[in-house]
Design a protein with these regions (language model features):
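Acidic, PIN/NYN-like endoribonuclease modules and their adjacent C-terminal/linker elements
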Residues: 1, 69, 100, 104-133
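Short, well-structured N-terminal submotif of metal-dependent ribonuclease cores
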Residues: 1-36, 51-61, 122-133
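Short beta-strand scaffold positions
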Residues: 4, 36, 74-75, 93, ...
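Alpha-helix capping/helix-boundary segments
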Residues: 8, 40, 79, 98, ...
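A generic local structural motif
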Residues: 20-22, 94-97
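Alpha-helix C-terminal capping segments
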Residues: 25-31, 83, 87, 98-105
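Acidic catalytic patch
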Residues: 38, 42, 60-88
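Short, amphipathic alpha-helical segments that act as regulatory/interfacial helices
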Residues: 45-48, 103
Length: 133
C-alpha cells in the first residue's frame, strides 16, 4: 500500500497538469491500495475550494469518489464518512472533521456560534462556550 499526498489527489481531481496526471491516476489504481490521511483530505478540500474555486457539490462528489474507491484505505474511515455527510449538509469541512473526531462525553466546546448551530442541526453534540468566567 502507498500513502498519497494532497497534490496527488488534486492532480487526479482537477486534471490540471498533463505531465503529472498519468502518474497520479496510476497511484489511485495501485493494486495494493492507497492510504489517505484525514489531514490530506482536509487540505484537498481547502485546495479545491480556495485555489480552484470549485462549488461545494463538486468538492463533495470528488472527495466521496476518492474515498469510495475499493482500494482506498482511509484514516478513521467512519469519521471521514460522517464529516463528508455533514459537509454535504452545509457544515464547513474542517469543522465537520473536528466534530467527527471529537469523542468527548460532553461534546465539542467552541466559541463559534455558526459551528454550534450547524452541528446541532445535524444532531451533533457541539456546545457554545461562554467567555464569561
Amino acid at each position: 500500500m502507498i500513502a498519497l499526498d494532497t497534490n496527488v489527489l488534486v492532480r487526479c481531481l482537477t486534471l490540471d497538469d498533463p505531465t503529472q496526471v498519468p502518474a497520479a491516476r496510476r497511484a489511485l489504481g495501485h493494486t495494493a491500495g492507497f492510504f489517505v490521511a484525514k489531514t490530506v483530505l482536509l487540505e484537498t478540500e481547502w485546495v479545491l475550494r480556495a485555489a480552484y474555486k470549485l462549488p461545494r457539490t463538486s468538492i463533495h462528489a470528488a472527495l466521496s469518489g476518492v474515498c469510495g474507491l475499493p482500494n482506498a484505505y482511509l484514516e478513521h474511515e467512519g469519521q471521514m464518512a460522517q464529516a463528508l455527510a455533514d459537509y454535504a449538509a452545509g457544515m464547513d469541512f474542517a469543522d465537520a472533521l473536528h466534530v467527527a473526531a471529537s469523542w468527548a462525553d460532553e461534546g465539542l466546546h467552541t466559541f463559534d456560534r455558526r459551528l454550534v448551530k450547524a452541528a446541532q442541526e445535524r444532531g451533533r453534540d457541539v456546545r457554545l462556550m461562554s467567555s464569561l468566567a
